[in-house]
A protein has these predicted regions:
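Non-transmembrane, membrane-proximal soluble domains of secreted or membrane proteins
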Residues: 1-215
Length: 215
């Protein structure tokens, strides 16, 4: 399970940790040190990690929660013929199955520099072109090795700041804690919008959120 959040002009990528559950977010906690408003009081957030690139295992269903912080963006992977709006305050969701690794696609295209790329397909401002994030589709062994090397944001940034007395966990008793997006594919399947489409472009789209599908 991963969460991809659009902002001017970049993508923030958050992975669920070994518990396979993303920590909750609360818009009242958004500030310069916590742009996603992650609720660090939620133990589920303690093993989540942020990533500079999107790494996915081949032939494995991937659940993606999609959102935005400012204006409307669009989660768009052109090689997959797949896109979904990223709307502030309106969570969207996709799950799909990558079927061709990056290395295999480089051989197929005869382009050793080929990379899958997440782009924004909405004109979101002057820095729109900068909204590109590299995607690597790898074997499961490669993915597990990469995953084991990632460090949780809570353990490396938040906890040391708390221990140093430079950061204090806020009280959230009176604030509306919420899950930033759907947390599993069950909600998607129960919405009646599940579809199955097999393309020859390196992925298999197997589901979308209740608001519809763009592909």
């Amino acid at each position: 399970l991963i969460e991809v959040t659009g902002k001017q002009f970049a993508w923030a990528v958050r992975y669920a940790g070994i518990d396979k559950t993303l920590g909750k977010r609360d818009f009242t906690l958004v500030n310069g040190d916590n742009e996603l408003g992650v609720n660090w009081n939620d133990a589920a957030s303690h093993d989540d990690f942020m990533a500079d690139e999107i790494v996915l295992p081949v032939n494995t269903p991937v659940s993606v929660n999609i959102g935005a912080l400012d204006v409307i963006h669009d989660f768009y992977i052109p090689e997959f013929r797949m896109m979904m709006d990223a709307v502030p305050g309106v969570p969207t969701h996709l799950w799909f199955r990558p079927t061709i690794t990056t290395d295999s696609m480089r051989l197929i295209t005869k382009n050793p520099a080929f990379d899958y790329v997440l782009a924004c397909n909405k004109l979101c401002g002057s820095g729109h072109y900068n909204m590109q994030k590299k995607i690597r589709i790898v074997s499961m062994d490669e993915y597990l090795k990469w995953q084991s090397e990632q460090k949780s944001y809570y353990a490396t940034v938040v906890k040391p700041a708390i221990e140093a007395g430079t950061f204090k966990l806020p009280s959230t008793e009176n604030s509306p804690l919420h899950e930033s997006t759907l947390t599993n594919t069950e909600s998607s399947e129960n919405s009646g919008a599940k579809i199955e489409t097999k393309l020859s472009t390196g992925f298999e789209l197997v589901g979308a959120n209740k608001d519809g599908v763009e592909n």
